[in-house]
Amino acid sequence: PDQQVEPASLTKIMTAYLAFNALEEKRLTLDQQVNVSETAWKTKGSRMFIEPNRPVTVQELLKGIIIQSGNDASVALAEAIAGSEQAFAQLMNEQAKRLGMNDTHYMNSTGLPNAQHTTTVQDLAILAQRMIEDHPKEYGYYQMREFTYNKIKQSNRNRLLWADPSVDGMKTGHTDAAGYCLISSAKRGDRRLITVLVGADSEATRAEESLKLLNWSFQNFDQIKLFDANQAAIEARVWQGTAEIAKLGVEKTLWVSVPRGM
């Protein structure tokens, strides 16, 4: 889980995460018009097909990033938030550190290849979890199957949205170096699981193996409550404090997945 890998378009989860933060903090609005720069328009790879001199809304850009995996949309939104993609990458790195993604370094908003643009599957899992927890309403974008912009309809590349009704996200990625990648999440009953797969040899393989991993995990692990929120879990003796004993607990209810039958 700690091996350095290229995240490819899985990068765009962080791009969207920062955009959702900006919306929450009222630094952006969904209907805000964004001017498309020549830089964004000329970005290579998967595209939403935005055009210079044709403003696009923040909401359209988010759909272009999440559903269509548009590199052009990612750069346009990065510029709207930070002024330049380079400045936005700095924000991405600062946010990664705050989330505990200590083995991740971003160089761009898209995931286009760069030797210094790397992460780990562990860090990707952290990012996916925080996206779902911190922006539960906005996470619904990842369940959308298609989006039409500029009269061009594109389908979500996450095949699991069609293959399994319990799957409600998240994001695909692909470069020659990264292979075919997929972070997927499914909720069955009260349980949600996230899987991260990188380096598959085809779109079909990444979908098939991700679904196998989800099914295996649901079948072979149970979720148990370790500690309730805001309840004393342990007591610790305090040296020269205002009290001899301090009660320690967790802010949020803590669940853990354990092998079934333990």
Predicted features by range, described:
Residues 102, 113-118, 122-262:
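Domain-terminus/edge residues, biased toward the C-terminal soluble/receptor-binding domains
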Residues 1-125, 129-134:
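Active-site-adjacent loops and short helices of periplasmic peptidoglycan-processing enzymes
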